[in-house]
From Swiss-Prot:
Annotated transmembrane regions: none
Database matches in Pfam families: Acyl-CoA_dh_1 (PF00441), Acyl-CoA_dh_M (PF02770), Acyl-CoA_dh_N (PF02771)
Span of the transit peptide along the chain: 1-25
UniProt note on tissues of expression: Expressed in flowers and tubers.
Organism: Solanum tuberosum
Protein known as: Isovaleryl-CoA dehydrogenase, mitochondrial
Length: 412
């Protein structure tokens, strides 16, 4: 494990042992999921997120903007959270997806919006560059993305091409020295602020899935602009917009992977995208319990805390088991990916399960708080609105079910 995290975590742990203190930000029953180093990493990230991200969560949601008064990207970069799976030669930690999922969970626990933007930056953009970029591309783009100096994004979907990626209309015409892009991309997370974007466009409109190519787009390229920032139901502080390409020239060296192999680039990273993003709803479920448990212990009706009533205990038990089963599934799949086995049906399965359970857990959190749960002074409404995104983004629940069913059928 990276020495920076070891030093911070061990020092923190020794301090608590000496002073007989319990970890302030520990999650429930992780002893079966992590070794000591992984637990220390989780605790270290949890403390960072609760101190630096959680205090801004309400304002992020209310103002519909990623924080402007504090540079969270630089803070996360300084804490080495932006290059967890990146090889050390490019400035990363050289760790696996289990550690990446831990960080994504704890950041999402502090703020769903920041968690989603973090996932888009580190997994959709950085991970695609690591997996498919040339040495020169990695040297050029990764250091600034890992430090937080630059923000990353990925753009695949279009107004009329979501799950049906091959139907995209954005074109890339070959010219001397590169390509000229024309078209639009929709629902691009981090789009308004990103300096480095992975964008998919058709280089051969007659070749179907073999006619799509991935490009590295830089903010400021002539002909590239961002349109309106979208006003979303949830994940409001995760800035999202439409991208516009009007005769945008992209040099040949900015092709990511091979020409005509864009679908391979996309699909080869999609399983890992689903895995890492599945940490988001797990973090939201933890946030729900962080609010509900103290509330039902303090809130009194009929002369005693409502947490003593069996109906409330039943709801809390359901929330807890939903979270823990999703968490166990998540880290089991992450561990398998780190061992070299990337299972498509389980990467789809873990986000399908976690996303739908997170929506239900958030609904139960609102119910446990009663009237207060329906008031925006409390964060439970935000949890629900944020959780719902994960049933839609990175492939809808319906697409995930189709993938799982198809893979199971192929195995017979």
């Amino acid at each position: 494990m990276h020495k920076l995290f070891v030093a911070r975590s061990v020092k923190s742990a020794l301090f608590r042992i000496k002073n007989h203190q319990k970890p302030q930000f520990a999650a429930f029953s992780t002893s079966l999921l992590f070794d000591d180093t992984q637990k220390q990493f989780k605790e270290s990230v949890a403390q960072f997120a609760q101190e630096n991200i959680a205090p801004h969560a309400e304002k992020i949601d209310r103002t519909n903007y990623f924080p402007q008064d504090v540079n969270l990207w630089k803070l996360m970069g300084n804490f080495n959270l932006l290059g967890i799976t990146v090889p050390e030669e490019y400035g990363g930690l050289g760790l696996g997806y289990l550690y990446h999922c831990i960080a994504m969970e704890e950041i999402s626990r502090a703020s769903g919006s920041v968690g989603l933007s973090y996932g888009a930056h580190t997994n959709l953009c950085i991970n695609q560059l690591v997996r498919n970029g040339t040495h020169e591309q990695k040297q050029k783009y990764l250091p600034k993305l890992i430090s937080g100096e630059h923000v990353g994004a990925l753009a695949m979907s279009e107004p009329n091409a979501g799950s049906d990626v091959v139907s995209m209309k954005c074109k890339a015409d070959r010219v001397e020295g590169g390509y000229v892009l024309n078209g639009n991309k929709m629902w691009c997370t981090n789009g308004p602020t990103a300096q480095t974007l992975v964008v998919y466009a058709k280089t051969d409109v007659t070749a179907g899935s073999k006619g799509i190519t991935a490009f590295i787009i830089e903010k400021g390229m002539t002909g590239f602009s961002t349109a309106q920032k979208l006003d979303k139901l949830g994940m409001r502080g995760s800035d999202t917009c439409e991208l516009v390409f009007e005769n945008c020239f992209v040099p040949e060296e900015n092709v990511l992977g091979q020409v005509g192999r864009g679908v391979y680039v996309l699909m080869s990273g999609l399983d890992l995208e689903r895995l890492v993003l599945a940490s988001g709803p797990v973090g939201i479920m933890q946030a729900c319990l962080d609010v509900v448990l103290p509330y039902v212990k303090q809130r009194e009706q009929f002369g005693r805390p409502i947490g003593e009533f069996q109906f409330v205990q039943g709801k809390v038990a359901d929330m807890y088991t939903s979270m823990q089963s999703s968490r166990s599934y998540l880290y089991s799949v992450a561990r398998e990916c780190d061992s070299g086995t990337i299972n498509t049906k389980d990467c789809a399965g873990v986000i399908l399960s976690a996303a739908e359970r997170a929506t239900q857990v958030a609904l139960q959190a609102i119910q446990c708080l009663g009237g207060n749960g329906y008031v925006n002074e409390y964060p439970t409404g935000r949890f629900l609105r944020d959780a719902k995104l994960y049933e839609i983004g990175a492939g809808t629940s319906e697409i995930r079910r189709m993938i799982i069913g198809r893979e199971l059928f192929k195995e017979q």
